């Protein structure tokens, strides 16, 4: 079986887990949790342990763990938000492609299991370079704070 090797995420794996959910916390504080966009039914925030620059997580406001528990309005809003965030990433970062997905359960790769969320990960040709393999380092050329401000400005 192939494995995704992301050594820079080890800090997240080993970090003390908060009792309350990152998405629910994000609903209360915009800047502290890198929230870039909120709607009535969804919240979008930058992943602080990104697979790539611009890695955004989008979740329903309601704390549910499975897609099948969402109401139709939440599903529609989630995908409209995904489309809006993607367009914003297109303008701000100009990636060559994306990985977009949902991991449900730890066996499927979910790191946050209690609150459903989807990932949108911008990709560029050659972004799977040698740095993680040789130096246990992921090259992210922009600070989360700077990117957060740019995306907030683009989305609002």
Located regions from the model:
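Active-site microenvironments that recognize anionic phosphate/pyrophosphate groups
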Residues: 1-53, 58-59
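C-terminal helix-cap and adjacent tail motif
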Residues: 4-16, 122-156
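Short glycine/proline-enriched loop/turn "hinge" motifs that connect secondary-structure elements
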Residues: 47-51, 112, 122-123
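Short histidine-centered catalytic/ligand-binding loop motif
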Residues: 56-78, 134-140
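Catalytic metal-binding acidic patch
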Residues: 60, 114-120
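Long, well-ordered alpha-helical scaffolding segments within enzyme catalytic domains
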Residues: 72-95, 145-152
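A short glycine-rich, hydrophobically flanked beta-strand micro-motif that places a catalytic Asp/Glu
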Residues: 93-106
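Acidic pyrophosphate-coordinating catalytic loop
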Residues: 105-113
């Amino acid at each position: 079986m192939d494995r995704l090797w992301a050594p820079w995420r080890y800090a997240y794996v080993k970090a003390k887990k908060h009792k309350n959910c990152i998405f629910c916390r994000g609903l209360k504080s915009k800047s502290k949790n890198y929230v870039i966009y909120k709607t009535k039914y969804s919240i979008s925030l930058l992943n602080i342990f990104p697979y790539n620059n611009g890695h955004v997580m989008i979740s329903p406001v309601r704390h549910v763990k499975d897609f099948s528990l969402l109401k139709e309005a939440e599903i529609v809003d989630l995908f409209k938000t995904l489309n809006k965030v993607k367009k914003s990433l297109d303008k701000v970062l100009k990636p060559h492609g994306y990985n977009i997905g949902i991991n449900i359960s730890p066996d499927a790769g979910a790191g946050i299991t209690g609150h459903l969320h989807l990932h949108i990960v911008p990709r560029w040709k050659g972004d799977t370079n040698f740095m993680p393999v040789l130096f246990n380092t992921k090259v992210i050329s922009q600070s989360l704070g700077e990117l957060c401000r740019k995306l907030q400005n683009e989305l609002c």
